[in-house]
Regions:
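Sec-dependent N-terminal signal peptides
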Residues: 4-13
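Feature for soluble, non-membrane regions of globular proteins
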Residues: 17-188
């Protein structure tokens, strides 16, 4: 079992051991007057840090593979940390990709129809989404789709690397960590 896990781990690490480049989201600064440019710039910098950390961890993993990874605490610690940094990078990309739109969800779209079918109305879904977002603590609220059961679900995810619903596809992501709002909106 241990040999299988090690060989599988090496295979997966090789798949992800490419350099990631932070996406440029500066176009959002002028598209979103309700969020101060300074807040967005700080948030973009934080996101860039996640991208840098993922690349750094990939390099460290490559270096560790030259040693005895089966008993390496360093290798195992890097693997644990990887989920935090990688998921932080991906969740920020999903969040920023959601921002800047000025159009309402098309009532004829499949997503809109699914929301109404499952929640009873679009307003009911918004109410549920906002109630989920008001969960005390830091984290993310994610509208997710379970393709297996064809269900939508508003989920609260506290940490980047704990709590994701792995069979769900994220459709809408909102960052509710303090860095996303506190300097502009305080605790309101």
């Amino acid at each position: 079992m241990q040999k299988f896990l090690i060989s599988f781990s090496l295979f997966v690490t090789t798949l992800v051991a490419q350099e990631y480049v932070a996406k440029d989201y500066n176009y959002l600064i002028n598209k979103m007057p309700e969020i101060h440019p300074e807040l967005l710039q700080v948030h973009f910098k934080l996101y860039g840090g996640y991208v840098d950390q993922v690349n750094r961890l990939n390099l460290l993993l490559e270096g560790e593979k030259k040693g005895s990874i089966e008993t390496s605490f360093t290798y195992q610690a890097i693997k644990r940390r990887y989920g935090w940094e990688y998921d932080g990078m991906v969740l920020h990309e999903l969040y920023f990709d959601n921002l800047g739109g000025s159009e309402k969800l098309d009532q004829g779209s499949l997503l809109y129809q699914k929301i109404v079918q499952q929640f009873g109305s679009y307003d009911n879904w918004i109410r549920d989404f906002k109630a989920t977002a008001l969960t005390r603590g830091v984290g993310w609220v994610v509208l997710s789709w379970d393709s297996k059961k064809d269900l939508l679900f508003n989920a609260w995810i506290t940490e980047h690397d704990t709590g994701p619903l792995y069979k769900y596809t994220p459709l809408l992501v909102v960052d509710l960590w303090e860095h996303a709002y506190l300097s502009q909106f305080q605790l309101d």
